[in-house]
Amino acid sequence: MTDSADYDPVCGMQVHDRRWVTTYRGREYVFCSEGCLALFRRDPALRLSHKGERARYDLVIVGGGPAGLTAAVYASLQHLHALLLARDLGGQAVDTSRIKNYMGYDLVTGPELLGRFRDQLLAQKYIEHRLDEVLSVARVADGFALQTRHGCRYEAPAVIIATGMHRRRLDVPGERRLLRRGVSYRLVHELERYQGQAVAVVGGGNSGIEAATALSRLGCRVTLISSGPLTGDAGDIARVEAAENTVVLTDHEVAAIEGEEQVNGLRVQPRGGGRERFLDVSAVFIEIGYLPNTDCVAPLVDRNRDGEIETGRDCSASIPGLFAAGDVTNGFGKRIIIAAGEGARAALAAGVFVRARQSGTASVQGPA
């Protein structure tokens, strides 16, 4: 845990205002929320030494994206003694430059929408949160035990896995070596840097088309590369194909990314073989989809051939007490609004399960 006055000593979040402040042993500490301040005041020594912490909760939620944040709010509304564990609050959605038609918004940015999610979480009174990575989830006699990267162990009768997905890689020469030196998976952080330059976008789905359109508007000379036909929104496809400064290469694959200290080009070739072409570009934005983050729980749950956790209509996984929500599941439609809805459903179902356990009532659960 970072030992800086700019970081909340309870949860590890960076604090940008000084609304909640206290002094302990001559040092001032700032907090992200009234809840974290209250936890600190109960036992300052414990909160300053997170490593090795052990605690038991009614429910532990793993993941800080739309599904996890919504699940946390709905757990709080049920007055469950719950904990949210996440590497960050926001997830992949924070990197989305434009979100269309999320209810209540015609258009909103990822940082703006997920900032509102986070603010709503921090306003809750019954949910604790920590910035930490869950390494493993194991079954124990009375539920589950979760081990974290900071050396903490938490137990609960119910767990919600809302860990989302991570970006798929091309796995071609030069990709890893030139990461952050022209190779990027996060367009929103790199836009202005490449204004007016020649760039390539790899990926023919919504994300790739959105990236190509955004770069085109900045005056970049864009080559959009897709291994098959473009598959995004029809209107967006028409716009990107009509852009004068954009070339679309379908049925092509990247063979290698070139450059020494910085990307200076890439080699592409038609699918199924054919002559390679060299494209002179200064950046490559990779937008080829995601893989589910299931490493921490993979031995426990049933997954489909894509590695997604199989869930029932109440978001239950294959083991009683274990639930999953959002993009990590086999649910149809990888959308922020769907992930948020699944987070709420999973929390409500987990609440029913926990109360049944507490009352000794049998609970039937499992994918259906």
Describe every region a protein language model picked out.
Residues 4, 12, 20-58, 115-116:
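Extreme N-terminal leader/targeting segments of oxidoreductases
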Residues 45-46, 50-56, 165-213, 218, ...:
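Glycine-rich dinucleotide-binding loop and its adjacent helix/turn
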Residues 63, 156, 162-163, 169-171, ...:
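Short, well-ordered coil/turn residues at beta-beta hairpins
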Residues 114-115, 121-148, 153-156, 216-313, ...:
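A Rossmann-like FAD-binding core segment of flavoenzymes
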